[in-house]
Amino acid sequence: MGGNQALTSGQERGDVRRGHLERGDPHSEWLARLHQVFGGAIDIEWAIARAGAAPGQTDALGVPPGTRVVLQVRPALFPVRRNETLSLANHKEILGDPPSRWMVGMASAVAFDVMLYFATIEPVVATWKEPYAVELAERAWLNVSAFYRLMDHWGLPRTMITEGLGGETGANPRDARFIAKRFIRFLPRLLRMQWASLWRVSGIARQLKDFDRRLEAAAGLPDLWRASVEILAESIPSALALGGMLSTANRVRRVLRVRSGGTIVTHDMMAEYAALAELPDAQSRLAGLDAWLEKYGHRGPLETDPSQPRFAELRPALESALRRRASPDNALASARHSRLRAALLRPLFLPDEWRERFKDDLLRRWQRLRAKILAQAKIAVTEGWLEAPEDVFLLAGDDLSAAPATWRSRVSDRRSRLEAARSLDLPCTASREEIEAIMRQAQASPATEPDRQELSPRLLRGIGLGRRVVTGTAVRATTLLSLLARDDLPEQPILVVPTLDPGWSVVFPRFAAIVVELGGELSHASILIRETGQTAVVNARGACQAVAEGALLQVDPVRGEVRLL
């Protein structure tokens, strides 16, 4: 560049500008082919021949205009740092924002082990050295770049990732398409992937028994930390296997225009709680609550994070809600099919049933894990190592392996970091460098409220669930407990929330429709909503900013639209 020998020889680094290469980008495909020739970590100096010449004309070297010319290729002299596309969509939905330090530490600890599941099917994945999750701003961000890379490699649509996990791929129409040549080439590998997924699913019962043994053997807090990491490292690949099967089944269902037909455990949980609320007297409702908690007490809001309380611990809130209420506001029912049609459709919904059952079984172990962690934390409080048992969830592996006398100071430091991270105005999906820039800006300037003065849109688009158009009044909420304590709902209430997980199902019957800012078509909550036949629009970006409490809304799931009237 301008005869700068140090720069062109690779001894110095110039102005580095990173960009996001979209699917179908010609430079990306050309560089990928070049890398196949040389391999390894390399610096490539290249240029594009002078443009603007007449057709057929060449430059002094005989190169046609627009041709890419390789000037030199050399081993990289600087560390190659990935600028991954990261997303909070799925983790924000199931873990909250921000999650506990314990949960973030677990996700970071298993980040590379999880991707080995794909490497057993596609060996090239091991050479990518891509983590499943990246820790930034006290959160575990899903590394969607790794999954997009895998989809591109196999010729599959990138939208298969966002369907199951939420988030967004952008406006590139190529993201929703197959890459025909690659798909045909790797079709045997994809069939092998489905077989491997079935094999892993068939071993889930053995896996759960192994989890039981590990939990039983774990004693102190460091042991419980290791057990939780080991269980998570095994359970995420199983969940991914089920998710892959579910995504395939969902595409078949779209072709057949079949919307519902499964029997999932969270639907039973919701229906049985709704039946309690319909009982005529409070005493009967409270008596039935014991039986309900026996079956579903291991569930709860943000239940994937062990730091979050289960329904068994939230009995006072559930009891108070049942004392005040005699019946739900909006009766829900699953879609009805003839026996023959239901039997024919059920195989298409088995992945839904298996995934929800696996999560339910896993959460029973998570409840036991939480109880054992808190029991050991109480001992730590007695010893003076912690101020309160719940403080243990502000610690992770490195903290727990340190001297217990340091735990209090570590908790204090982590709490300060969490409070600072909580105030960050973070995008749902962004590049690593964009997120780091937001963090640096927050450190350099005092915390301020994000600017929300721009005009709110009157029309929001997302993923529609259900068929019935509903007009009603917006009811905003950020926590399940705030809804359980609330009686003053309008006649046609429409729940508007930033995220949703199956724990919220106990209040679903109280609402005529649901609007969720984040979420995918195949998320746990979306599957439940679909099976109830309830009207909803998920992944309605900007809903919590645009929709005020009491606003008049129309939710149209067929169009996937939310209109402010």
Describe the predicted segments one by one:
Residues 1-26, 63-115, 513-515, 531-532:
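Extended active-site and interfacial segments that coordinate phosphate-rich ligands
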Residues 17, 72-74, 390-396, 526:
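Short hydrophobic alpha-helical segments that form membrane-spanning helices or hydrophobic packing faces
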